[in-house]
Amino acid sequence: MAKGKLPLNDMAGGAGRMDVLVRALMSSILTSHGIREDVEFTMILLGGPGPARRIKFVSNELKGVHAEERSVGGKIAAVIKEPMPPRGHWVERSPGIYDGGGDLDMTLDEWDCPIIRLDADSKNLYSGVLPSDFSIAEIGFILGDDKPLESTRGIPRSLGSSWLQGHTCISIVHFLLDEGIQLQL
């Protein structure tokens, strides 16, 4: 759902499975008792008529985000009721929440870091040796929904042979990065 009124009481149906995106966002930016300081999460909304819309959440700038799906859904609802900015332009809608037109390829073009494309049918992510100059700030992950992404950009890696929900993948990736587990890039 890229524009219109987001039904907060029916995010799993009337909002085109916005509940899945909200859980992924929450897994990306929230810890047990706070907000991660080193995460940018960009969701790409393709639902409905019209072009794709991007909403970017910058964790160290966020204010008023709470660990409750409807509250986070309300932040998204406030963005999508606004007119969409042109492709390639970001408009700050509230602290740490940016709105812009664009698609996955445009987003990846903006990132200046190695990109890992999560795909259950690829080599495992968590084996190998970390590069000596590895930094969390210098890696990006992309994932889709219940099927592989159409984009072939990024290094394909797997978290296992089963297709997992996006928010679970994000939690696993955070664990691997937080614990310094060796990644196969």
What positions do the PLM features span?
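Post-transcriptional modification and biogenesis factors for structured RNAs
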Residues: 1-185
